[in-house]
A protein has these predicted regions:
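A short helix-loop-beta-strand connector motif used in the catalytic cores of GNAT acetyltransferases and
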Residues: 42-55, 72-75
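Conserved beta-hairpin
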Residues: 50-68
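Conserved GNAT-fold acetyl-CoA-binding loop/helix
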Residues: 23-42
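Conserved acetyl-CoA-binding loop-helix of GNAT-fold acetyltransferases
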Residues: 99-116, 134-138
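Conserved catalytic-core motifs of GNAT/GCN5-like acyltransferases
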Residues: 124, 142-156
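A short beta-loop-alpha structural element at the N-terminal edge
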Residues: 2-16
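Conserved acyl-donor/pantetheine-binding loop and adjacent beta-alpha core of acyl/acetyltransferases
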Residues: 67-102
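Conserved GNAT acetyl-CoA-binding A-motif
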Residues: 116-128
Length: 162
């Protein structure tokens, strides 16, 4: 597997992975994290434009897509409740990670490669996304507290540092 920046040629594959991920989350008891059409092809294209959309490719097939931004200043991470961040150093963020195949270690690989590139990463997930919470903890992310999105929705915040 390899991680690489997404290109316009990847948009359809990434959008399909997001469609399948929304269905997977609904079936797994998490119908509220990604509502409606979010995330979608427009989000992938926006990330391509600012250099933050990535894909994981295996034998020429796009098997995962995600947003990875270095030196982020995510406004929703400025305040954290019921805990604290591990440090106040510059950080990277991972958002919108989704995979085509489950149980093959694809998310673990993506997180590992991101951490090799940047050793201070923040990420959040919905309280009902139990599979992602387990993956985050398995991959060395530590729960830090609760953050609120701009629309007021609550998320569980995690961080992994060197």
């Amino acid at each position: 597997m390899i991680i690489r920046p997404a290109t316009a040629a990847d948009v359809d594959a990434a959008a399909k992975i997001y469609d399948e991920a929304r269905a997977f989350m609904k079936e797994g008891g998490n119908p509220n994290q990604w509502k409606g059409e979010y995330p979608n092809a427009t989000d992938v294209l926006s990330g391509i434009d600012d250099g933050s959309s990535y894909v994981c490719e295996e034998e020429g097939e796009v098997v995962a897509t995600f947003y990875f931004k270095d030196n982020a200043d995510d406004p929703t991470y400025r305040k954290i409740y019921g805990g604290e961040w591990k440090n106040s150093d510059p950080y990277s963020v991972i958002h919108r990670i989704a995979v085509k195949y489950h149980g093959r270690g694809i998310v673990d690989f993506c997180f590992s490669e991101c951490f090799k590139a940047r050793q201070n990463i923040k990420i959040d997930t919905h309280k009902d996304n139990i599979p992602m919470q387990k993956v985050l903890e398995r991959c060395g992310f530590r729960y830090c507290g609760i953050i609120y999105l701009e629309n007021g929705e609550e998320r569980l915040a995690y961080q992994k540092t060197k």
